[in-house]
Amino acid sequence: MKARNILFLILASLLLCTAVSAAEYTDVSDAHWAYKQINYLDAEITGYPDGTYKPENTVTRAEFLTLFARIAFQEEWKQAESDDWWKAAYSVCIAHDLLDGINGGRVNAMPRSEIAALLDRFCSGWGGVHERADAANQLNINWTEQRMESPEWQPLFPDAAEYGNSVLISANQGLLTGYPDGSFKPEKGVTRAEAAAILARLKAQLALREKGCEYVCTVGDYWLMQYPASGSVGLALYEPLTGKLVQTVGLWKAAQGVNGYVAFDRLLSGSDGIYVWGRAGL
């Protein structure tokens, strides 16, 4: 058991030590689906001594929570005193009441349902998060019989219904996505590539929030964000990882011609704004 723990500490340190860019990994080409996300996290995540990133390796609870804490609570994580590399992250997350229901061993894979619960709690204070989820859920209920015009529409993640709103909220916030078959696979762990994608979205949204932007939905390769305009509220499309403004969108206008996507298929009223749910690449 002692030897196993030592091995775990060695492997974990490889995930969290000196950072390099994705371009330097021999097993992550620029054609890899998570190349940009891995590169975006070059200050938080790293690879192995042999120059690989091992994108298909599964991430443990301790590893995911440490990376999460470094992004979500950077200064607190730096100041937290700990004898072990993973304890600072746990201490910070516990201080923010984020670990209720996350009781599995730290050396085990962190299932997607727990990641959803963690992100749900973390985002609970953000404006419109729960309203978007409620609106989307109501749409699913109301349109079970009356289908959307798009034949591709279906209720969000049927295999995650028992996990309450946490999966719905995390997905509606643009932080978690499902699989091509429409499933969420709540008990499945995440790979290093998937963890990078999830945490890159979180880091990017935190950066945009510092500019006063609120996430609305994903439109193709872009995020539709609500931003403060002079005397009103505006909508605009942003590149997620660069934060670059792509196109402004009026509140009541459809944004067309951006990668062939239409920003608005349906407009839903939330308690603090207008929320989008429908075809729009969601």
Identify what each model region corresponds to.
Residues 178, 218-219, 226-228, 238-240, ...:
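Generic beta-strand structural signal
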Residues 65, 116, 224-226, 275:
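Structural core positions within WD40/WD-like beta-propeller blades
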Residues 234-257, 281-282:
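Surface-exposed loop/turn elements that mediate protein-protein interactions on large endomembrane-trafficking
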Residues 1-5, 10:
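Positively charged n-region of N-terminal signal peptides that target proteins for export
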Residues 53, 184, 223, 233, ...:
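Hydrophobic residues embedded in beta-strands of well-ordered beta-sheets
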Residues 225-231, 266, 277-281:
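Beta-strand C-termini and the immediately following turn/loop, strongest in propeller blades
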Residues 9, 17-212:
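N-terminal propeptides
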Residues 211-218, 253-271:
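Repeated scaffold domains used in trafficking and secretory/extracellular systems
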